Amino acid sequence: MSGDTCLTTTLCPAVGPKPKTCSFKVGSLGNKYVRLNVGGSLYYTTVQVLTRHDTMLKAMFSGRMEVLTDKEGWILIDRCGKHFGTILNYLRDDTIALPKHRQEIKELMAEAKYYLIQGLVDMCQAALQDKKDLYEPVCNIPIITSPKEEERLIESSMKPVVKLLYNRSNNKYSYTSNSDDNLLKNIELFDKLSLRFNGRVLFIKDVIGDEICCWSFYGQGRKLAEVCCTSIVYATEKKQTKVEFPEARIYEETLNVLLYETPRVPDNSLLEATSRSRSQASHSEDDDGFELRDRVRRIHVKRYSTYDDRQLGH
């Protein structure tokens, strides 16, 4: 093992004789190693490292403060030992690489304050301020790279899912005059919804699918509705691709999918909430169950049927 820092081991508390107190003098120990037990974590270092800076550790190991030792000679410090190795590195080198996460920096700063290491406290405070000033994205939107990835994302999500598929390369014909604008409006609405419902709904993008512009809505791992925004129309005796922007329909399905935020709500209750009011006529219990299942099936078929039912050319 090279350097002054240490071996780190976690000890289990054991019943034994009470620790005894003793005093250290720099002249008596010099560069000899001392053994430290910091909250159950064991460290080896030298008195020279511990006394380089004017800190509480220097007071402990220069004879100004008494220290506790156990029967095996370990010097006991009643603090968490998680960041003590980092503190030793700072005492030896006057600089360290701070942790990446804010919580760990706060923990390290608390220990530095306890040991009165002002230089390390200043480093931690500056790092926390820098992280505070950094821009953090409001939400992250996955982009699908394969059908398996899409399936895995939807099945594992505890939130409702809204997916927008847009892929201009799927078009075989020319676009109608407003199609480009409508495609852009669909994308802009997706971005607005992802910001508005961030944290409540998982929004994903698909740029490799077989459609040109299509919205899909999922709850509890199941597909609930689909809004396809493209159709083929005839203009001047040739086929063209028409992209629409059914804004109201998209909002409606997005609000419907929010009913699936709580996974423990019974499925029948959710399905009934998104369907039309039930008939007032009296039926047997079996007939009611069959009617509900049939109505749900037809609702899904209706939701999926977003194309114009008229024949092409009419």
From Swiss-Prot:
InterPro entries xrefs: BACURD1-3, BTB/POZ_dom, SKP1/BTB/POZ_sf, T1-type_BTB
Pathway note: Protein modification; protein ubiquitination
Subcellular location: Cytoplasm; Nucleus; Endosome
Annotated ranges, domain BTB: 32-100
GO cellular component, one term: endosome
SMART domains: BTB
UniProt record, GO biological process: cell migration; immune response; negative regulation of Rho protein signal transduction; proteasome-mediated ubiquitin-dependent protein catabolic process; protein homooligomerization; protein ubiquitination; stress fiber assembly
Keywords from the UniProt entry: Cytoplasm, Endosome, Nucleus, Ubl conjugation pathway
Residues in coiled coil: none
Listed GO MF terms: small GTPase binding
Superkingdom classification of source: Eukaryota
Functional note: Substrate-specific adapter of a BCR (BTB-CUL3-RBX1) E3 ubiquitin-protein ligase complex involved in regulation of cytoskeleton structure. The BCR(TNFAIP1) E3 ubiquitin ligase complex mediates the ubiquitination of target proteins, leading to their degradation by the proteasome.
Family, as annotated: Belongs to the BACURD family.
Subunit structure, as described in the record: Component of the BCR(TNFAIP1) E3 ubiquitin ligase complex, at least composed of CUL3, TNFAIP1/BACURD2 and RBX1.
Descriptive protein name: BTB/POZ domain-containing adapter for CUL3-mediated RhoA degradation protein 2
Underlying gene: TNFAIP1
